[in-house]
């Protein structure tokens, strides 16, 4: 059986965008740093990594649509932090951000990863932004690198 998979290395020529929400910036700033760390560790050049900031997670799909329509990037990493509160707002924002990112990704057939935390409380978010459970921004960028290379291997 022939196995086709993406590798975890970059040539240094790849252009990548990170789209991150500013809301809950104490968390998302750490996710962005994790993504940047992964990009550089795997051979990416810092000057080929662009950070696009949006107000909140709900706006991520709209920015993603614009970025993919321009066709300037080899991949896009979406980052955010949605923390449950006492109202249904969490459910609406997390559902729409998730569906929106998935729909735009499918529309363009692009290498995109979803690094949006959806947590019950601030403690869980902190744990996933570089403490107990690792850094989900790092993981999202690592997944993006693998997917960009997989797309090259399957001719996408």
Swiss-Prot record:
Which Gene3D superfamilies does the UniProt entry name for this protein?
Answer: Lumazine/riboflavin synthase
What InterPro entries does UniProt report for this protein, alphabetically?
LS (IPR034964), LS/RS (IPR002180), LS/RS_sf (IPR036467)
| Listed pathway(s) | Cofactor biosynthesis; riboflavin biosynthesis; riboflavin from 2-hydroxy-3-oxobutyl phosphate and 5-amino-6-(D-ribitylamino)uracil: step 1/2
What are the GO cellular component annotations? cytosol; riboflavin synthase complex
Reported EC number(s) for this entry are: 2.5.1.78
- Database matches in Pfam families: DMRL_synthase
Molecular functions per Gene Ontology = 6,7-dimethyl-8-ribityllumazine synthase activity
Reactions catalysed, semicolon-separated, are:
(2S)-2-hydroxy-3-oxobutyl phosphate + 5-amino-6-(D-ribitylamino)uracil = 6,7-dimethyl-8-(1-D-ribityl)lumazine + phosphate + 2 H2O + H(+)
GO terms for biological process, alphabetical: riboflavin biosynthetic process
**Which EC class does it fall in?**
transferase
The UniProt entry annotates the active site at: 89
Entry binding sites for (2S)-2-hydroxy-3-oxobutyl phosphate: 86-87, 128
Q: Where does 5-amino-6-(D-ribitylamino)uracil bind?
A: 23, 57-59, 81-83, 114
**What does the sequence similarity comment in the record state about its family?**
Belongs to the DMRL synthase family.
- By its UniProt entry, which PANTHER family does this protein fall under? 6,7-DIMETHYL-8-RIBITYLLUMAZINE SYNTHASE, 6,7-DIMETHYL-8-RIBITYLLUMAZINE SYNTHASE DMRL SYNTHASE LUMAZINE SYNTHASE
Give the protein's biological function.
Answer: Catalyzes the formation of 6,7-dimethyl-8-ribityllumazine by condensation of 5-amino-6-(D-ribitylamino)uracil with 3,4-dihydroxy-2-butanone 4-phosphate. This is the penultimate step in the biosynthesis of riboflavin.
Designated name of the protein? 6,7-dimethyl-8-ribityllumazine synthase
Q: What is the lineage of its organism?
A: Bacteria, Pseudomonadati, Campylobacterota, Epsilonproteobacteria, Campylobacterales
- Gene that this polypeptide is encoded by: ribH
